[in-house]
Swiss-Prot record:
Residues 52-229 are extracellular. It holds the Pfam family TNF. It comes from the Eukaryota. This is Tumor necrosis factor. Homotrimer. Interacts with SPPL2B. Cytokine that binds to TNFRSF1A/TNFR1 and TNFRSF1B/TNFBR. It is mainly secreted by macrophages and can induce cell death of certain tumor cell lines. It is potent pyrogen causing fever by direct action or by stimulation of interleukin-1 secretion and is implicated in the induction of cachexia, Under certain conditions it can stimulate cell proliferation and induce cell differentiation. Induces insulin resistance in adipocytes via inhibition of insulin-induced IRS1 tyrosine phosphorylation and insulin-induced glucose uptake. It comes from Cervus elaphus.
Length: 229
């Protein structure tokens, strides 16, 4: 019986190719295991996004941060941060004259613009938007014609002469209010704005002819400013 088993094992060993055949089977099994393990690992890495194409970050608006639109807006925003800008408001305590303030809550001075002698001083050459608004108010129309003027002037470093670059004139009263008639208040706003090529050191002023008629009842009604483009 034992001899028969030994003969059977010997025959099986010869059929399989002996010890070398067993070694080949072991190598094949090990290779198959490694192949399956590698494929499983690769699948997991791809599934969880560890490798492979990365998801694009998005801005709060839902646009990809790498899109041309977002890049353009970002560049424009960064460039605007360094551009000169100024917004000054009228001093409501300066009765009888128009004085500008740069140190109150609604005022803004940035990137080199200065307020000197009631004038804005331009820090760099370039195109600038210049703007200003005034608001006049009266209780009634006087017997003589009433003309209100608002002028923005420039004193250029190249020729040192005061030149009006924006000017407006209005007449709120077309006729005198009769003595027997009830006085009716009138309001007259004047807004001006334009784009100009300015030089470093240029001085800009915004002036009126009748400051006693300025209306300071509400903040933000009388202002003057420049923005580099």
């Amino acid at each position: 019986m034992i001899r028969d088993v030994e003969l059977a094992e010997e025959a099986l060993s010869k059929k399989a190719g002996g010890p070398q055949g067993s070694r080949s089977c072991l190598c094949l099994s090990l290779f198959s295991f490694l192949l399956v393990a590698g494929a499983t690992t690769l699948f997991c890495l791809l599934h969880f996004g560890v490798i492979g194409p990365q998801r694009e970050e998005q801005s709060p608006t839902g646009l990809s941060i790498n899109s041309p639109l977002v890049q353009t807006l970002r560049s424009s925003s960064q460039a605007s941060i360094n551009k000169p800008v100024a917004h000054v408001v009228a001093n409501i305590n300066a009765q009888g004259q128009l004085l500008w303030l740069d140190s109150c809550a609604n005022a803004l001075m940035a990137n080199g613009v200065k307020l000197e002698d009631n004038q804005l001083v331009v820090p760099t050459d370039g195109l600038y938007l210049i703007y200003s608004q005034v608001l006049f108010r009266g209780q009634s129309c006087p017997s003589t014609p009433l003309f209100l003027t608002h002028t923005i002037s420039r004193i250029a470093v190249s020729y040192q002469t005061k030149v009006n670059i924006l000017s407006a004139i209005k007449s709120p009263c077309h006729r005198e209010t009769p003595e027997w008639a009830e006085a009716k208040p009138w309001y007259e706003p004047i807004y001006q704005g334009g784009v100009f090529q300015l030089e470093k050191g240029d001085r800009l002023s915004a002036e009126i002819n009748l400051p006693d008629y300025l209306d300071y009842a509400e903040s933000g009604q009388v202002y003057f400013g420049i923005i580099a483009l």
